């Protein structure tokens, strides 16, 4: 079970809703994955009740999955705050995935503006899930601002590279043991999702890896199983890696010279 801001969710997978081949494939993918939440950009659905936006919103409601609006595309504090406030009105929720991009090529979050925007939104009653880097100090500043969960990236959005800074992510997990950490962006394979879950991360958010795959519906299922398996492995307590071989069969009854070291 995933707990965020005091609310419990049955799944540790969050799923984006952009760039699917058809609305029907999106709906089937969501139903197959059964995610905790589905993310959506206000700019994607439109605002003002036009036909396209209303139809997309109706499709999301049909899934029965809670919606997590995001501020995708925002590059200033004011823009992000305004978008979040509009999203609250449109989707009738205090949840917001806060995105504030600082570089157009890498789509890397601007952590300085991110902290400022998070402070404003939290004071305004939002439940903020900030998309951030794996930088420990930046993450601490976001927690100081009032965030109760973080969404560090594995790699730049849409790259599918997996956890490119594994050491930093592991340190982040180690140093923030009580903070829900959801890996957001950069995962391309179910095995990569399972890996970060095995490290102890609390959840995974995906979009491109599913929506742009050859078969989004089956890929959604694959990722859902990977996230579940990775978490189960973490909770089971994996054996530690070692450099020396260790027999798994008992040695009782074997000749004494079998235990000699050469």
UniProtKB/Swiss-Prot annotation:
GO terms for biological process: thiamine diphosphate biosynthetic process. The active site is at residue 97. Pathway: Cofactor biosynthesis; thiamine diphosphate biosynthesis. It is found in: Cytoplasm. The keyword NAD does not apply. It is an enzyme of class 2 (transferase). The keyword Chaperone does not apply. Catalyzes the rearrangement of 1-deoxy-D-xylulose 5-phosphate (DXP) to produce the thiazole phosphate moiety of thiamine. Sulfur is provided by the thiocarboxylate moiety of the carrier protein ThiS. In vitro, sulfur can be provided by H(2)S. This is Thiazole synthase. It comes from Neisseria gonorrhoeae (strain ATCC 700825 / FA 1090). The gene is thiG.
